[in-house]
């Protein structure tokens, strides 16, 4: 297969002298017939215990896959552990999550390859909602009833990137710089010349190794595609959807349990409205966590979710005892070449059963004074958050109150943008914007205090963020909603609704239920598929 090297050895020589700690190599392979597998079954079979997939299944440009990260950082509270997955070395770190992350990320820097995707290597993982406890002083009232980490990040030096617009596959490899410029400073001229010659030889060997690794990656990608195309479960899934349709999946809530009953939730809604009447807050996002025991593999549930509800910020993080299966539609924040952007979602209606009903629901959503007021309030909150780390006067709203459609619901969305101030970093952007205002409320700190008071259990990954930070300081993080967290054989699903002064408690409860439907249906389909597989009826 014809390929194009997007980085030359001469570029490596320049970057090596500039002192970058990591050197990127990217090979481009055109795949005009389509380059994504129908299912990711082979990818998970090939992966180490840690792996991640980030997909833009609706409207996005790139799909990212990494199967062999080189290191892991995970923490809960102020205790963290790092592990070098190549050497097996590990160690404990004590500190606030974003400080620990910053110290772990800081030594690794690489130049961006012009014209290539921003993310070609770096860090991928998630921040759970409870990382906010290190950013704001919050009470401790909700039960911490799981040992799911507050955050997990993987460092990746090999990454597959599929470009949906150009139908090209990029195989990206990052290699450590063998000798940094700073190591030359204390040497004599003759010693420096000898070292430069030796370094050029080492650099050439590293470059050749990077080329070989991308060639192996291409072969592995071909195997992943072939396995996906011959996966016996995939046509059965498609047949079920085409024969019965999405609405034929019934009783999706069967087997789910919650510590937050409908009665308790509606009482909590009324308590929020009392706080609003007192002037404490304008809006609070109140959520319900449900859980159940799983027989299905989380990987197969993800396959169902991408069929049932393709979303722009889908993804899966795979760890030894934890899977994050995300069908998120919402961006928390993006940082690309110094431009910061957020895309808040607030305002929801169910999808109509007919085109006319769908249009009527959209018109109702757009004309709702309640939904518009709530949305604009949260857009203002995002403007203020981004304004904390943006150049003065650069924050603007290029898109306001647009309807976006998903399989089971429609939402109001807007776009907020600004220019990152000099000296600010991706970690500063996270500190300013996390957690998102659309899933807490306004004002943010007081709403988080009320959430802690009224929700019976801690949120864990829910309403945190999943995504990536690259070696050049760019970043893209979603908001973890429409997401399943699976620890062992227990699945956790949480959904929320924005409560305002004129909210109807029952309607807000139903909104939470509607938002859970797509993931619950994916779970139900996965469970039924697992039962058939155990009986020998399907290859899934």
Task: Identify the function of each model-found stretch.
Residues 1-540:
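Extended alpha-helical targeting/anchoring segments
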């Amino acid at each position: 297969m014809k390929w194009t090297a997007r980085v030359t050895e001469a570029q490596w020589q320049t970057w090596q002298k500039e002192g970058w700690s990591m050197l990127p190599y990217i090979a481009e392979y055109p795949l005009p017939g389509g380059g994504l597998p129908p299912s990711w079954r082979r990818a998970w079979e090939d992966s180490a215990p840690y792996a991640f997939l980030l997909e833009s299944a609706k409207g996005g440009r790139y799909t990212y896959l990494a199967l062999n990260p080189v290191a892991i950082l995970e923490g809960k509270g102020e205790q963290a552990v790092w592990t070098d997955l190549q050497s097996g070395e590990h160690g404990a770190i004590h500190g606030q999550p974003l400080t620990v992350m910053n110290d772990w990320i800081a030594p690794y820097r690489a130049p961006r390859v012009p014209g290539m995707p921003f993310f070609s290597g770096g860090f991928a993982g998630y921040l759970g909602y409870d990382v906010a406890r290190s950013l704001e002083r919050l009470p401790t009232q909700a039960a911490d009833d799981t040992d799911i980490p507050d955050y997990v990040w993987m460092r990746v030096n090999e990454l597959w990137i599929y470009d949906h617009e150009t139908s090209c596959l990029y195989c990206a490899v990052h290699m450590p710089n063998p000798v940094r410029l700073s190591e030359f400073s204390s040497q004599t001229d003759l010693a420096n010349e000898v070292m430069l010659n030796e370094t050029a030889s080492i650099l050439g060997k590293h470059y050749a190794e990077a080329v070989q690794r991308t060639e192996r990656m291409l072969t592995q990608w071909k195997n992943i595609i072939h396995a996906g195309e011959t996966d016996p479960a995939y046509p059965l899934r498609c047949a079920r959807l085409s024969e019965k349709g999405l609405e034929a999946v019934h009783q999706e809530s069967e087997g789910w349990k919650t510590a937050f009953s409908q009665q308790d939730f509606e009482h909590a809604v009324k308590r929020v409205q009392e706080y609003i009447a007192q002037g404490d807050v304008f809006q609070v996002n109140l959520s319900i966590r449900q859980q159940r025991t799983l027989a299905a593999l989380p990987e197969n549930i993800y396959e169902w979710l991408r069929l049932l509800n393709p979303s722009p910020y889908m993804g899966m993080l795979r760890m030894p005892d934890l899977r994050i299966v995300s069908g998120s539609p919402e961006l928390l924040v993006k940082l690309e070449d110094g431009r910061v952007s957020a895309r808040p979602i607030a305002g929801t209606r169910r999808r109509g059963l007919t085109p006319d009903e769908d249009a009527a629901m959209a018109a109702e959503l757009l004309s709702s004074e309640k939904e518009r007021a709530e949305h604009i309030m949260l857009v203002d909150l995002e403007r203020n958050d981004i304004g904390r780390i943006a150049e003065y006067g650069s924050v603007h709203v290029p898109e306001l109150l647009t309807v976006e459609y998903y399989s089971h619901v429609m939402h109001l969305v807007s776009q907020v943008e600004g220019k990152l101030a000099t000296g600010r970093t991706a970690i500063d952007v996270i500190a300013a914007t996390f957690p998102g205002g659309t899933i807490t409320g306004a004002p943010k700190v007081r709403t988080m205090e009320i959430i802690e008071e009224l929700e019976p259990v801690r949120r864990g990954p829910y309403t945190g963020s999943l995504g990536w930070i690259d070696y050049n300081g760019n970043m893209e993080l979603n908001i973890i909603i429409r997401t399943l967290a699976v620890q062992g054989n227990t699945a956790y699903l949480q959904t929320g609704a924005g409560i305002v002064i004129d909210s109807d408690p029952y309607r807000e409860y139903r909104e939470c239920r509607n938002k859970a439907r797509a993931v619950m249906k994916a779970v139900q389909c996965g469970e039924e598929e697992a039962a058939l597989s155990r009986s020998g009826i399907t290859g899934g």
